[in-house]
Swiss-Prot record:
GO cellular component: ribonucleoprotein complex; ribosome
Function description: One of the primary rRNA binding proteins, it binds directly to 16S rRNA central domain where it helps coordinate assembly of the platform of the 30S subunit.
Entries under InterPro entries matching the protein: Ribosomal_uS8 (IPR000630), Ribosomal_uS8_CS (IPR047863), Ribosomal_uS8_sf (IPR035987)
GO molecular function per UniProt: rRNA binding; structural constituent of ribosome
Assigned protein family: Belongs to the universal ribosomal protein uS8 family.
Signal peptide annotation: none
Annotated Pfam families: Ribosomal_S8 (PF00410)
Subunit architecture: Part of the 30S ribosomal subunit. Contacts proteins S5 and S12.
Superkingdom of this protein's organism: Bacteria
Designated name of the protein: Small ribosomal subunit protein uS8
Coiled coil: none
BP GO annotations: translation
Keywords of this entry: Ribonucleoprotein, Ribosomal protein, RNA-binding, rRNA-binding
Length: 130
């Protein structure tokens, strides 16, 4: 199974169940995606827990204090192992007319679409978040 799709599905399921915290197995790519989600304000906090085997990431999800709606409305995988999606800096996709974020894997690491566009580098579009 695709580990990134599994990571996104665990977050999606935790949001649907209104969980405050979700724990996912750690990997370097998941850590970088988590950092981008935190920097863009989609999650409240995160903590990397190292263990003997793999470690885990505890993610505190962000909800609106009054309406209890999640900051993440939709999170979807774009580039899949069977069909990779690559883009140039000029053709970087706009998510929800700029209101959402595309997370991109570039030669300089994993970053948001806006950061990649500013650095004028393209890469593999991992997922959309809005």
């Amino acid at each position: 199974m695709d580990p990134i799709a599994d990571y996104l599905t665990k977050i999606r399921n935790a949001i649907k169940a209104k969980h405050r915290v979700v724990e996912v197995p750690a990997s370097n790519i998941k850590k970088e995606i988590t950092k981008v989600l935190f920097d863009k304000g989609y999650i409240q906090s995160y903590k990397f827990e190292e263990s003997a085997v793999q470690g885990s990431i505890k993610i505190a999800l962000k909800y609106h204090p009054l309406t209890k709606e999640s900051a993440i409305v939709k999170i979807e995988r774009i580039s899949k192992p069977g069909l990779r999606k690559y883009t140039h800096a000029e053709t970087m996709p706009r998510v929800l007319n700029g209101l959402g974020v595309a997370i991109v894997s570039t030669s300089k690491g994993i970053m948001s679409d806006k950061e990649a566009k500013n650095l004028n580098i393209g890469g593999e579009v991992l997922c959309f978040v809005y």
